[in-house]
Amino acid sequence: VQYDNLDMLENSYGINLLPLAVFSTERYGDAHVFAPRKLPEEPFKPRDTELYSRMHKAISVIMYKLEGQLVHRRREYGMEDRDMMSRVNWGAGTINIDGTDYPLRDTDFPTVYPNDPTKLSEEEAALMEQLCAAFMHSEKLQAHARFLCSAGSLYLKRNGNLLFHGCVPCNRDGSFMEFEVGKAVTLSGKAYFDYADRLARQGLLAPEGSEEREEGRDYLWYLWCGRNSPVFGRDHIATFERALIEDKATWKEPKNHYYSYTDEEEFCRKILHSFGCDKPWSRIVNGHVPVKAKEGESPLKGHGRLVVIDGGFCRAYQSQTGIAGYTMFFNSLGMRLAAHEPFTSIEDAVKNGRDITSHTFNVDELSHRVMVADIDTGEEIQSRIDDLMKLLEAFRDGIIKVDQAKAKQR
């Protein structure tokens, strides 16, 4: 709702948002604080803004409540302080953050029980049942989720390069942060990525209603916005603060210490080595953080050992980045990046013959061409050759015997 993506939910995925619209209209009046962001080429009509604002407010309040329940249910996340609803003084209309009381920009919350602020009202619970059913029964959405499970991963090693979205969580000194995943069991670096990948799939594939499904489902939320999550890479997400607190000092989302070290080549090499990427051309291909190209920021970090290619295709970030994202190319000659200019509008494209314009530049030119034997395909072929040679050797040594009857039939 905030980014005007209702068409995607309703038309593409067939999810009925009428129950949310009806509920928000009946329960909320003025909701201008939750007005959706206006995109220049898609101006809203006044009545749309009012309805979308109410819908945004209604689902946001439900989200704040459910997040409060989750962080207490999963204390191992260490995020009880993100139960924002329980920190509000409902009588005074303020919230205490780090010892300071901040006034809320909106104090009209008719569905909140001050003595139990994370509890859903009966109507909210019924609405969530309807929405969950709609999401679960959307064939296209479920097909996309299955595709993510079968083809996706939390990280990817390809031809000596390491691709991941967020970060490898690190401590202040640059060492890998350790996460407790069981009694006396801690994981860090690649081992934690593997654990997180398995738990995320568990949230989508474990039997419905099982403890494993519930644990994995909660962990999917943690991956999205959890403290030092390898996908999120920040201390917390300030959704509540941005919506309801005027003071922008509370909007900060402190980044993990990983981002303090990405300009150091040795740090990047340490990560590559820990994931088994030790080719001369090996690089980290990172996402998540918008590159402010219009301010001269480079997508290359750590003397070229890390490449950031995120932050542009989302229109909400294009005002910050000045571009519409990057595309990376890697072939036998080296690596190139293409920086794309934002797509203005269909009208402009037709009238002026403008399309998405791209500018390419070299990241690295290799001193010698990469051969098939140097990449993943070559390693797979070599592995098959090695297996066949072992079979041949076993045959010549008499370990494998030929069935003469079958040999004659052939």
Spell out what each predicted region is.
Residues V1-R410:
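Feature recognizes metal-dependent phosphohydrolase scaffolds
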